[in-house]
Amino acid sequence: SDPLPEKLTPLFTAPALPVFHLPTDVDVQSYDVVMAADSVDRGFDTWRSTLREDQIVVLIDHHPDIDMPADITLIDTEHSSSSEIVYEYFEQHQIPITLPVATALLMGIVFDTGNFKHTNVTPRVMRVGVELMKLGAPLAQIGNVLFAQTRVGGVKLWGRALERARYFPTTGMVVTAITTRDLRECDAE
């Protein structure tokens, strides 16, 4: 098991600190149902072959490019995030949402909406955000933890990306690239 990533610990208070387990560190064979959420084909497929034939696989996502087979697939591109989908499931099935769950769900929404700044922000996701805040999820603190605590390495990496950026006036597109070497050299891994 991995501890909660250090930058996220201010969002949770003991004894509610969650422990994160990587799939490789969990005996997934011992579960009847395995759920994967958010960009599931960008990692879930690397260990899916370890599942038993009789295990139920549930995929939850808001990205349109998910084509992985599952027993239950819940993909809705009209939602801002997988967290919004999970919230609505809990709401429809009258599943109580604890403070740590409300915080985690709001964190997912804030991340996928760019702190409510992206074009995927809808009145519905704003309502969900308000409901999670009513349950105690700390919006300002989540925004600060996710977006305002930029490490020096991240700033250096942005510098490299901007330095290499090229503008194409015919399309209005700006293109840049960063490499794994850049990540390493900027200490932004």
What are these regions (language model features)?
Residues 39-42, 63-65, 180-183:
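Short glycine-rich anion-binding loops that position phosphate/pyrophosphate groups of nucleotides
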Residues 33-35, 56-60, 72-75:
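Hydrophobic/aromatic beta-strand patches that form the interior of the parallel beta-sheet core
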Residues 26-29, 49-52, 67, 97-99, ...:
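Solvent-exposed alpha-helices and their adjacent loops that cap or buttress functional pockets
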Residues 1-9, 28-31, 111-189:
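Hydrophobic helix-and-loop "lid/oligomerization" segment in the mid-to-C-terminal part
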Residues 62-128:
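Short alpha-helices
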Residues 1-49, 53:
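N-terminal small/polar loop signature for handling phosphorylated ligands or for N-terminal nucleophile
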Residues 35-38, 61, 108, 177-179:
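Short beta-strand segments
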Residues 44-46, 68, 185-186:
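Short helix/loop capping segments that flank catalytic or ligand/cofactor-binding pockets
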